[in-house]
């Protein structure tokens, strides 16, 4: 297969080369003067369409043995020209007759890359027949003359002296090094640089002092906080110990407190407690008389039992007294509230009806009035209520809404009625303190007409 392709491509290329040579010969025959002037001979050949993965060494292996040449240059494929990726090579033969042999051999020669793809090569004359000349480098005149260089010899002398000094005392070497560094620094510094350096050092020192002072204050505050916490713990521990001691003492020794009996109920309770105490003492004496032979342990138990009973009785009496005191205080507050409300309503009526109305009403209350609860309010006459309503509508300010009068419950007192009758009202308990009672003045028809 490959041989047939090679024969076919070889015959085709051979014909094209013969045509080119024939054209060259014709041109030479036509222009003999021009040929004599230039005497140009084609000797540079290019091999195109080589595999992109082919290297220069591999190409030389394929082309060997090559006729004599003075120029060989290989150019790999340019990846930017994808998919037309091909390598090429330029060869300049010394003998132009070798070009035909080379063309017959490698024109149409099939190269196979590492992937198994076939690339038939093409042999042509290069479009540019000139060959780039290699630049010859000038030979350095000082090459191989380093040992004769005076600077190199001076370096060797200094190096040998340094080796001798290294064997000397290290302290002297250190002093010499410090002296050299000082000299170098003195050469590089100026008064302005020294001033700036001193300023920086001063600022750094002040900063460090402030930092130390801040750290010291923080430590002092922390120590004070720890001390306060410790003192607080000690105080709490002492209080706890004292409380425990008080508790233990109260458990061991029960203190008896005597309180005064203020009320009659308290006297009754105290008498009852005394009776119980006397009976308890009689029982104790009864049991103690024949108990001369009993143990002291029984007597201690009886004493503790009596003390507990006494404490319970005293606690009960105390609670009862506190309850009575609270009841009295509530009654006092209620009476004060009723008095203040009556005073407020009196002032309001004076401003509303006039000062004489309240005085007349007070007189009527003294001679003809009596108090009653809401159950007796229906006994008012229809005419009286209409007269009172019409009077209020005439006198009061219509821009201001009427306020419903509120009067608290009746107090424990006796009032005389118009028919020389006495109405005794029972005392109001705290449970019925919320009930509202009202006072109404009822007079005779003549008195009403006189008021109008």
From Swiss-Prot:
Q: Which Gene3D superfamilies match?
A: 3.30.70.330
Composition-biased stretches, type Basic and acidic residues, lie in 205-363, 376-401
Write down the InterPro entries for this protein, in alphabetical order: Nucleotide-bd_a/b_plait_sf (IPR012677), RBD_domain_sf (IPR035979), Upf3 (IPR039722), UPF3_dom (IPR005120)
**Disordered: region residues:** 205-452
**What's the superkingdom here?**
Eukaryota
Q: Which is an annotated GO molecular function term of this record? A: RNA binding
Changes seen on gene knockout: Morpholino knockdown results in a weakly abnormal brain patterning during development that does not affect embryo viability at 5 days post-fertilization.
The UniProt keyword set, sorted, is: Cytoplasm, mRNA transport, Nonsense-mediated mRNA decay, Nucleus, RNA-binding, Transport
Asked if the keyword Transport belongs to this entry, the reply reads yes
* Location of the protein in the cell: Nucleus; Cytoplasm
The record's Gene Ontology biological-process terms are: mRNA transport; nuclear-transcribed mRNA catabolic process, nonsense-mediated decay; positive regulation of translation
An annotated GO cellular component: protein-containing complex
The job of this chain, per UniProt, is described as:
Involved in nonsense-mediated decay (NMD) of mRNAs containing premature stop codons by associating with the nuclear exon junction complex (EJC) and serving as link between the EJC core and NMD machinery. Recruits UPF2 at the cytoplasmic side of the nuclear envelope and the subsequent formation of an UPF1-UPF2-UPF3 surveillance complex (including UPF1 bound to release factors at the stalled ribosome) is believed to activate NMD. Binds spliced mRNA upstream of exon-exon junctions.
User: What family is this protein classified in?
Assistant: Belongs to the RENT3 family.
This one is known as Regulator of nonsense transcripts 3A
Gene this chain is encoded by: upf3a
């Amino acid at each position: 297969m490959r041989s047939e392709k090679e024969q076919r491509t070889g015959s085709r290329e051979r014909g094209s080369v013969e045509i080119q040579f024939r054209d060259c010969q014709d041109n030479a025959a036509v222009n003999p003067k021009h040929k004599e002037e230039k005497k140009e001979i084609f000797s540079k050949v290019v091999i195109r369409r080589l595999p992109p993965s082919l290297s220069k060494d591999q190409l030389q292996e394929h082309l060997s043995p090559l006729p004599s040449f003075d120029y060989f240059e290989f150019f790999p494929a340019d990846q930017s020209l994808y998919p037309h990726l091909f390598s090429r090579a330029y060869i300049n033969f010394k003998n132009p007759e070798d070009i035909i042999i080379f063309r017959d051999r490698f024109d149409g020669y099939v190269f196979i890359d590492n992937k198994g793809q076939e690339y038939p090569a093409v042999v042509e004359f290069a479009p540019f027949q000139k060959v780039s000349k290699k630049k010859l480098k000038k030979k350095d005149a000082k090459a191989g003359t380093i040992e004769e260089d005076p600077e190199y010899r001076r370096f060797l002398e200094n190096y040998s002296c340094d080796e001798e000094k290294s064997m000397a005392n290290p302290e002297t070497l250190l002093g010499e090094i410090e002296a050299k560094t000082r000299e170098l620094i003195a050469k590089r510094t100026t008064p302005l640089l020294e001033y700036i350096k001193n300023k920086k050092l001063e600022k750094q020192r002040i900063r460090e002092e402030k930092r130390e002072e801040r750290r010291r204050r923080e430590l002092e505050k922390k120590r004070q906080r720890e001390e306060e916490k410790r003192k607080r713990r000690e105080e709490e521990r002492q209080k706890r110990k004292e409380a425990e001691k008080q508790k233990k003492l109260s458990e061991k020794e029960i203190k008896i407190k005597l309180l005064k009996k203020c009320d009659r109920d308290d006297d009754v309770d105290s008498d009852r407690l005394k009776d119980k105490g006397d009976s308890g003492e009689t029982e104790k004496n009864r049991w103690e008389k024949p108990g001369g032979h009993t143990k002291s342990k029984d007597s201690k138990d009886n004493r503790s039992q009596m003390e507990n009973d006494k404490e319970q009785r005293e606690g009960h009496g105390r609670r009862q007294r506190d309850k009575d005191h609270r009841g009295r205080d509530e009654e006092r507050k209620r009476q004060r509230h009723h008095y203040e409300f009556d005073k407020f309503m009196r002032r309001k009526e004076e401003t509303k009806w006039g000062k004489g109305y309240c005085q007349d009403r007070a007189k009527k209350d003294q001679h003809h009035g009596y108090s009653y609860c809401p159950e007796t309010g229906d006994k008012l006459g229809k005419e009286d209520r209409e007269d009172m309503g019409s009077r209020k509508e005439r006198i009061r300010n219509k821009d201001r809404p009427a306020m419903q009068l509120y009067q608290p419950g009746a107090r424990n007192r006796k009032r005389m009625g118009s028919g020389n009758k006495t109405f005794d009202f029972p005392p109001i308990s705290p449970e019925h303190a919320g009930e509202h009672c009202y006072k109404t003045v009822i007079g005779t028809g003549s008195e009403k007409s006189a008021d109008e």
